[in-house]
Amino acid sequence: MEEEGLAIDDVQGRADLRRIDIDRVGIKGIRHPVRVRDRSLGEQHTVARFDMAVSLPHHFKGTHMSRFVEIINGHDREIDIASFEAMLAEMMQRLNAEAGRIEMRFPYFLEKRAPVTGVRSLMDYEVALIGEVSVATTTTWLGVTVPVTSLCPCSKAISERGAHNQRSHVTTAVRMRDFVWIEELIEWVEAEASSPIYGLLKRPDEKYVTEYAYDHPRFVEDLVRGVAARLDTEPRIAAYAVEVENFESIHNHSAYALIERDKRTADA
């Protein structure tokens, strides 16, 4: 039996003689319940997946893995940009790190009404908060992946009947000057697609969505440019990345496009 009060050796704090710095070390895939801001309901309860890591100097053998979990458990409150950056700052302080990164991903649900019948259903979207600290600079991104429908303009133009269409994923990540709702990012993307996607459609709705998409054909280039143009005109957005993947219905590959822009640099 160990003597009461006997100090336990801190193995992680021992020296490592190989003199190799580690860029990132931490934990991945830990799930934790969180509350996030909801434009309609005030807040929404969901479950987030956290990846957390810090840099480790060559003279330390290991980091303190348990502290990452303690930090998450200590933030039992609504997560927004400010509280997320506070979590990032706490991680840097408690791990005594010069650089670090937290990535938090969670499903976010919106109630949508079908375009004709008005029947209600839930749609889920993947949202991400990504924060990085390096050389005393903190960078935070808010991202959301929005599924939409895209219909091919070329297929429509050359075909006597119909046109090929498919589901597309539009992933938009932004750095903000002022607060932007998750719902706004979703709405901006859906407005540029051939058609939004719904959780539930009745026959009149399906007819409407089919014809609406046919009247609004979009190449992958059209879709990525349309979203980028909206973000260019939004003063609350400082920088953005828009990524579009069309899961082609007539090919065994996807079509892809990406636009990245730092408006602060472009406006200088």
UniProtKB/Swiss-Prot annotation:
Keyword set, alphabetical order: Hydrolase
Which molecular function terms from Gene Ontology are attached?
GTP cyclohydrolase I activity
Q: Tell me the InterPro entries matching this sequence.
A: GTP_cyclohydrolase_FolE2 (IPR022838), GTP_cyclohydrolase_FolE2/MptA (IPR003801)
List the GO biological process terms.
tetrahydrofolate biosynthetic process
Pfam families named in the record: GCHY-1 (PF02649)
Q: What is its EC number?
A: 3.5.4.16
Pathway, per record: Cofactor biosynthesis; 7,8-dihydroneopterin triphosphate biosynthesis; 7,8-dihydroneopterin triphosphate from GTP: step 1/1
Catalysed reactions, as listed in the record: GTP + H2O = 7,8-dihydroneopterin 3'-triphosphate + formate + H(+)
| Marked site positions, May be catalytically important | 152
Described by its record, this protein's role is as follows:
Converts GTP to 7,8-dihydroneopterin triphosphate.
Q: Which family does it belong to?
A: Belongs to the GTP cyclohydrolase IV family.
Which protein, by its recorded name, is this? GTP cyclohydrolase FolE2
Q: Which organism is it from?
A: Methylococcus capsulatus (strain ATCC 33009 / NCIMB 11132 / Bath)
